[in-house]
Amino acid sequence: ELFQELVDLGQNPKEKSDTVTVLEKIGHFLDDEVQRLFNWFKAENYSNQQINTLIAEHIDVQRLLQRACRKFDGGYIMAGLMGHGDAFVMRDPSAIRPAFYYQDDEIVVVASERPAIQTCMNVHHTEVQELKRGHALIIKKNGKVTEELCKDQLPRTACSFERIYFSRGTDRDIYLERKKLGELLAPAIMKEIDSDIENTVFSFIPNTAEVAYFGMVEGIQKEVDKINKKKLLELGTDATEEDIDRILSFKPRVEKLAVKDEKMRTFIADDASRDELVKHVYDVTYGIVKNNVDTLVLMDDSIVRGTTLRESIINILNTLKPKKIVIVSSAPHIRYPDCYGIDMSKMKNFVAFNALIELLKKDGKEDLLKKAYGDCKHQETLPPEEMQNAIQFLYARYTDEQISEKIAQLVTPAHVTVPVKVIYQTLPDLHKACPNNNGDWYFSGNYPTAGGVRVVNRAFINFFEGNNERAY
């Protein structure tokens, strides 16, 4: 739509990529702003040389950005530098993508992550400001810096996946939030292992899950403290020093079982090479697990495709001969695609979606897929603001536990006989841990913009038609 609008305006963009379209769009309104000022000053009988200087001084960056981004949809941080010396950084009106800045008498620096600025500029986190949603940080050639509204603000739906996985865990708030995500899973873990701490080894899948793992261990320790307190009270006045020592020594067994080759990044690998790559990423620490006695509990930050679990992690954990393997995800089920800057747009790649399909097949409800397809096709005929997510009713047929159970089956290789369980974060606990980043469309299907709803319906159409293309 933006591309066609440029054509209608008389522009000739050389390609349809997001970057080129945005550049052409802003460039068009920059030209228009320059022409407006030229006509204004020409009527005042200034010379062309004088007009050039006056345009550079009076160009209204806020106005041109307001006009250029009127029809933008999605999550974005856009930075631009103009030839005469003005610059800007603009954030989407829903605050989907993060942006922070620091300024003093000499410098202005903007980045998507606060710790990068803190490290580079050696400043306290309180000195780094968050760029407000729908605003642009405008840096004039003369050194004046202002935050100006460029697009009406929408409800804040900052991306929660940034907090779970993508952003650096060295940010103070993100670190605490990831710990909280792990801690909130402790009760579900205790239930799964039947509170058998003595025969359970706790570990994590390196390396982004490490902070959530610390939180999980703290949460498990709190549960253990409750057990120890109860035992001490039961002993009463008959307690001996040996009894007390034995009870107080009862602690979670915390080990580093999985070891990762830092040179291999599987999430960002292309589809063709990922399956082969993950087979060689992990190794394990031997000699810690009691064969056929110990349960292994491993924290992961999120489970998107399930490829790493199926092709590597569970295979190699199986060689340790545990009684049971429990994989814990600090994120809820990733059920829906993203179109706001993270390339996760093919539904067939999501293990949660594949679990849903398998459940529908098992229950003889495949006709519902046809219904969803028809609904999606109908949605495409509607104006964007009237579109609705036509996939949510499929997930609503099953509980989170049913889908998790099917996921556990899908990520377990055929030759593995050890029982595998998967525990996921709940949506309410996600929001409890990350209260300021409530954008949860990956998990809930509640997209903050009309463009997101169109993408999820198109993604399902592509899946149903066997079309292996991005949905946007």
Regions found by a protein language model. Name each.
Residues 143-159, 204-238:
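Terminal amphipathic helices with adjacent charged low-complexity linkers/tails
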Residues 71-74, 178-198, 211, 216-219, ...:
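Phosphate/ATP-binding catalytic cores across multiple sugar-kinase/actin-like superfamilies
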Residues 80, 91-92, 112-114, 141, ...:
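Active-site proximal loops enriched in glycine and acidic residues that flank catalytic Cys/His/Asp
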Residues 55, 68-69, 84-86, 91, ...:
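PRPP-dependent phosphoribosyltransferase catalytic core
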